[in-house]
A protein has these predicted regions:
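Histidine-/acidic-rich catalytic cores in large beta-rich domains
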Residues: 1-267
Length: 267
């Protein structure tokens, strides 16, 4: 979908941080850089439909994904990670047809991203969900974290099937079993450990890069399918709480969480 008009609903200049906003509309094939007044200052045309996220690198290049047709029929699927310069030229790319949602460029030039792997039904460990709702491909898709170097060689991998405490975090009773838990963010911290968000079970967890085990975890049903947890310089974690599927009125919030107390310090 291409936006018909950019604009600003409300702009309090004294409270807003002066910056640009990178806007990648789902379902489209463009990515836009927007100023504080809502004016488009830069547009990239992608070589296919947008996968999901986009981000600007320190060198000004755009890191983004587009969809491939070979992956499972999920949303939001990507499959093709691209680094595009200011002139629109592709200067790096990597294809993994099971890539989805989030990705990060590391200080060493490597790229970490979320992917899936299909676990056959008879081998899958699944708690909760709707029995018989496994994916038509023949099993359940579990999340995988992968890191590739500039040549596209995989140098590190974390597999959900090897480390995730399934018995502790069952799927909600009405959830299909075609995919387990729906990871949507992988934020790489300065120490290399990775903060991951699983939307369908309202869980965020910090994964130890060396052992693969959880160093810290927090779950709160009131988040209603969170996105984008990130660690601040003070150690706190911000996230976007979608607030969907709530008992009461649905509403979204931005939260700042003290990970030591597991308490909301700001919203």
């Amino acid at each position: 979908m291409r936006p018909l008009k950019f604009g600003v609903t409300e702009f309090n200049q004294s409270l807003a941080f002066p910056s640009f906003t990178l806007f990648a509309p789902s379902g489209g094939s463009q990515c836009f850089l927007i100023d504080m007044l809502g004016e488009c200052r830069k547009e990239w045309t992608l070589p296919g439909p947008l996968g999901n996220y986009g981000q600007l690198l320190p060198n000004g290049n755009l890191l983004i994904t587009v969809r491939t047709s070979e992956g499972p029929k999920f949303n939001p699927i990507g499959g093709h990670i691209l680094e595009i310069d200011w002139d629109g030229d592709i200067i790096w790319e990597h294809i993994d047809h099971l890539q989805h949602h989030d990705f990060n460029r590391l200080p060493n030039g490597n790229t970490t991203y979320l992917s899936w792997e299909l676990i056959p039904t008879e081998d899958a460990e699944v708690i909760g969900g709707v029995a018989g709702s496994e994916h038509p491909d023949g099993g359940i898709y579990y999340d995988v974290l992968r890191e590739v170097n500039a040549d596209g060689d995989m140098v590190w991998e974390w597999r959900m099937v090897d480390h995730f405490p399934f018995e502790k975090y069952p799927l909600r009773p009405a959830r299909p079993r075609e995919e387990y838990a729906h990871a949507n963010c992988c934020f790489v911290q300065p120490d290399g450990n990775i903060l991951v968000s699983w939307r369908d079970i309202d869980l965020i967890a910090l994964i130890d890069r060396k052992s693969g085990e959880f160093l810290w975890e927090m779950q709160d049903r009131r988040w209603g399918g969170q996105h984008d947890p990130r660690q601040l310089d003070n150690g706190n974690i911000t996230l976007f709480a979608n607030g969907s599927e709530q008992v009461g009125p649905e509403y979204s919030r931005v939260l700042e969480i003290d990970p030591n107390k597991k308490e909301i310090g700001w919203s």
